[in-house]
Amino acid sequence: MPKRTDIRKIMVIGSGPIVIGQAAEFDYSGTQACLSLKEEGYQVVLVNSNPATIMTDKDIADKVYIEPITLEFVTRILRKERPDALLPTLGGQTGLNMAMALSKNGILEELNVELLGTKLSAIDKAEDRDLFKQLMEELNQPIPESEIVNSVEEAIQFAEQIGYPLIVRPAFTLGGTGGGMCDNQEQLVDITTKGLKLSPVTQCLIERSIAGFKEIEYEVMRDAADNALVVCNMENFDPVGIHTGDSIVFAPAQTLSDVENQLLRDASLDIIRALKIEGGCNVQLALDPNSFKYYVIEVNPRVSRSSALASKATGYPIAKLAAKIAVGLTLDEVINPITKTTYAMFEPALDYVVAKMPRFPFDKFESGDRKLGTQMKATGEVMAIGRNIEESLLKACRSLEIGVDHIKIADLDNVSDDVLLEKIRKAEDDRLFYLAEALRRHYSIEKLASLTSIDSFFLDKLRVIVELEDLLSKNRLDINILKKVKNKGFSDKAIASLWQINEDQVRNMRKEAGILPVYKMVDTCASEFDSATPYFYSTYAVENESLISDKASILVLGSGPIRIGQGVEFDYATVHSVKAIRESGFEAIIMNSNPETVSTDFSISDKLYFEPLTFEDVMNVIDLEKPEGVILQFGGQTAINLAKDLNKAGVKILGTQLEDLDRAENRKQFEATLQALNIPQPPGFTATTEEEAVNAAQKIGYPVLVRPSYVLGGRAMKIVENEEDLRHYMTTAVKASPDHPVLIDAYLIGKECEVDAISDGQNILIPGIMEHIERAGVHSGDSMAVYPPQTLSETIIETIVDYTKRLAIGLNCIGMMNIQFVIKDQKVYVIEVNPRASRTLPFLSKVTHIPMAQVATKVILGDKLCNFTYGYDLYPASDMVHIKAPAFSFTKLAKVDSLLGPEMKSTGEVMGSDINLQKALYKAFEAAYLHMPDYGNIVFTVDDTDKEEALELAKVYQSIGYRIYATQGTAIYFDANGLETVLVGKLGENDRNHIPDLIKNGKIQAVINTVGQNNIDNHDALIIRRSAIEQGVPLFTSLDTAHAMFKVLESRAFTLKVLD
């Protein structure tokens, strides 16, 4: 069937900011889809609010709108652009929900816009729990006994009929948001209340729990001619009951018999055909491990997280082909771009095993609830490919970057058996390590299988690894054993630990014995046909399929899994760096471990190595490829952390050199550099012991800012007000040592701003200065950043440019650098310098139209800034105002405090741009889903130190129609200063309504809550913040952000004046 000629212009909706449940996979799929449609000659209009994405680059679509994905703004763009069709299936749940809203509000019908890929009826049938249930019954597909409810009372009634345990699944939500498992009525009421609130259609499915069944996924494709195929099946290591995004997943499925595979495959194909989906679809099924009984859990009628995994696992580009199918092409007409010899109708075949492991944020959120369930908690994931399960699992494990290189974590051998078994039973994020420890203690597989419902097959594979550890320990320096364990994925570091020697000794011994990895190609067809794809993974086998060209090459290290502090921004920089390398005439090689990202799309680079980013794995690729050099600047802290070992091994690091990286990161060297350059910084010291820290703080004076050196995202950073808190921090938050000192700085309360700059060693280019709305103390990644700056004087700007030049030349920076400043009493201080790309690079690249990563890469490769057209020093500012605002995932992370501070908590970002600050702020808040009505009730509960400022803020909110509610201390202060307030209680004050109840009953439209450092753990304040998050009420923990919101509301308000 030829492609359609009756449509010319197609709008694609992106997925917005990265949040838990919806990450970089939609940048990958959206980019693929836009390019695929352009390839077919269609005009593509893209709407997305996330500036950190490749898909929002100008060359990906014909017209790019970085605007809020809300009904108001998408409708405006539709009216302006008048596209013929809309493709909503590549923007995750955000895209689907927006398509539904446009349809229900009559916009699509009014503007005569057709939905492509998946019809509204199919979205409804898959997402609306009632219609889905009816469809499954019509198809004779089994689903767990369930009831659709629109109220808590209906949920209780159903529970009384069938009993517990139950699972609550809200309709039209993402990553299991609002859902969960219930063992009793109290839990049912709590979860259903949240679920109904979070479901855009106020609907939940309450179903009998089938926790303990195997969870299997099928990624399927269908075209308009009813051709359908299975791209990939996947099996979760964890049973039903743990969200698939939080589970270890293997592809292809490992424990299914032919009969079971055929049964579930037929069911998946029946479902996609019945839904008449044209494109990709994900079907999740539960299989009874003891019979052929199965249930359909759910269907995602769109490209999903699993689609990205299936694409990278097989090499089959699902999103690219889904876009072509959406415009009428059929699977037997489209050539598979990976083989270039077969058609897309051929089902991929795998001759390897893929393991996906989730990356959790609990290293940042130690107070978070680590128990896994039906609501997703992982921020990102890694993928590894091997020839056997053990190899792929161990490679995935060391890709996580959580400080482990094997399925063993420190101190577990000291854990009691009772604690061990409890941790295994509870199913937390680190259960895999506890299972391995239990096997080391000779617990039987049967016992562990009964505790966890994990298939014995997988537990047996863990036992193989544990037995090999034992074999290694008993046969020190045995070459044959070394060869055996390398085949099973053991790292040099893990072997060194068991042999009690260092990693270099293992590496040298292995190389002398000729035990070297080979690289195999991912080709979608298990080598059955010729393939042209340069997509490789390592294994210890015989034939090497990665052929080395004569062309000079450059290796770029990616940034690994998405986590808080290191998000998709670094992948954006990596992709642009590769583009510049290719333009400069070199062969570009990428090494990365993240299946969600654009950088691991095989078409981006000349060669892709899907490998862990560890010293061993990187050196193996370098030994084979012998590149001219390695670029580390765009891989975040992941790549920078490898600099020392790579340099020691004689690898040529391109750009800023190791000794200069150290001068920026090492406290004493950095202080000496600043002194030599005559640049002020807040007074500070380095401490390697608790007593040194206390002495340093006494010299500086409290409050002080404390943090470990060499961190990203402000991990373990804290503002400390007194000696007691400092001692507590030194003994619990960090392990200080001469190798890992703690930095102690004066905490300056002032205006914060930052610059990204490019240096060629002689001149610098500063694309722009970003001014933070929140004052110093809130992590830069959690602050709203404004470009160009709105309140900085010319003198301050000149000083910032001068200091940036001095630092760039003084630190011998070649390529990117990021500098953060604080301005107090009109004096500029340097807080920190990062001689690498930062998370603001994509935002600044978009708003200045300078492709910063490309320019920096060419400079790194020897070009000079004089050869570009951007000039030197500070680039002329934009006429528009642009705001980068953070996006948070607190709804997914129970027990995590939403109070902002020096440790980063946001998972993503959005951008708002307009002709003035107020309009840009409005767009930024809307894009971040922080919406406030023009009037209502606002609660103030603030720290004593903030009361004076909060009073002025409350007065202006009152002036535009808000009624001020306040807790006792705040109310007394407000009343004494002439501001009338409604007194409210905190918790347990039964004589009046307390805040959580008011929030729950919809009486409060916003909460402003600030806490002094001594009261951070205040239980009442924590519950108030949590209530606001759970009920979707705007929460401000910084008065600066609340003031920015006031500016928006004020700009929307009319002046009402009595006639004089």
From Swiss-Prot:
Ranges where the record places region Carboxyphosphate synthetic domain: 1-401
Species in which this protein is naturally found: Streptococcus agalactiae serotype III (strain NEM316)
Domain notes: The large subunit is composed of 2 ATP-grasp domains that are involved in binding the 2 ATP molecules needed for carbamoyl phosphate synthesis. The N-terminal ATP-grasp domain (referred to as the carboxyphosphate synthetic component) catalyzes the ATP-dependent phosphorylation of hydrogencarbonate to carboxyphosphate and the subsequent nucleophilic attack by ammonia to form a carbamate intermediate.
Domain of life: Bacteria
Name used for this protein in its record: Carbamoyl phosphate synthase large chain
Entry binding sites for Mg(2+) 4: E832, N834
Biological process terms in GO annotation: 'de novo' UMP biosynthetic process; glutamine metabolic process; L-arginine biosynthetic process
Binding site for Mg(2+) 1: Q284, E298
